[in-house]
Structures are given as structure tokens and as C-alpha cells.
Amino acid sequence: METMKIELATIQDVPALLDLQCKAFGPLCKELDWEDAPILSETLEHLYEDFAQCTTLKVENEDGLIVGSVHGKVDDGSLYIGRLMVLPEYQQRGIGKRLFREIQSRLPHLRAWLCTCQQVRPPYEFYLREGFKPYQSEVVGPGLTWAYLEKTPMTGC
């Protein structure tokens, strides 16, 4: 991808976002033997409901295929970041990093937080490198820990 343009997703993108979600998270869940992961059983109806409450960003390839996306929602000063996803064949190109940083810059907040599976090391370590710190965890299955991470802005003197 020569140029990476981040755009707001539209309601018409929801079916493609569900497809991206299955392709991005499916292999990871299978690798962890977590085939009943909630993210894999989400319905189109649920995604439409969720879409209406969030700001969703997307990156498309030259053919108009959505290859990356993230969503965010600010509630009482806290930005929840969710569904950072990139098609496997487009990973390691900076798409996820750009989307992740862009959602934080577009939505004013006092604190940002997210949750991720601690056993999926690449995204977990990426979030740590981006300044997020663990504040809570919960066992969700055999050998599976859901980690809650947060980041607060640096304050000056």
C-alpha cells in the first residue's frame, strides 16, 4: 500500500468490518484453542448496534477493500479503544499503529483504556510500547487471561 489514508467508516461498511473481524481474529483464536471467543460469534445486528455508539476508522487498499480498522468511544472522559484489527496479509506495515494513534488523537479524552488477551503477545507488547499499563486482569478460560490496560496523559510541572 503506497499511501495509507485513514477515513471514518460508514454504516455501509459494517458487513465488511464483520468480515475483517473474522479474518483478523479468527486465526489468533484458533491458535489459542479459543474457538468460542465472543468476538467470533458476534452478529451483524450486534455490530450495527455497536457501530452506532462508536467512532470507527478504516483503511482501505487500492481496490476499496477494508484492510484495517479500529473503533473508540469516549464516556465520562475515558476513551475505550476496541477492535484494532488488520488483515493478516497486511500486518507489519504500520497500519495498526497508525489507526491506534489516530483514534486517540481524534477523540479527546483524559484516559484511554482497552482490553486484550495477554497470551497474544504481539498486540499486548505493542500496547505496552505505546505507553499503556496493565491495571486489571481476568481469567477467561484455560490458559487465557484478559488484560485491561490504560494510559493517562503525561502531566507537566
Indicate residue ranges for each PLM-predicted region:
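A short beta-loop-alpha structural element at the N-terminal edge
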Residues: M4-D19
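A short helix-loop-beta-strand connector motif used in the catalytic cores of GNAT acetyltransferases and
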Residues: H46-K58, Y80
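A short, internal acetyl-CoA/4′-phosphopantetheine-binding micro-motif in the GNAT/acyltransferase core
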Residues: L84-Q91, T116-Q118
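Conserved acetyl-CoA-binding loop-helix of GNAT-fold acetyltransferases
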Residues: V86, Q92-S105, R129
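Conserved GNAT acetyl-CoA-binding A-motif
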Residues: R106-Q118
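Conserved beta-strand in the GNAT
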Residues: K58, L65-K73, Y80-M85
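Conserved active-site alpha-helix within GNAT-family acetyltransferase domains
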Residues: K97-R98, Q119-Q136
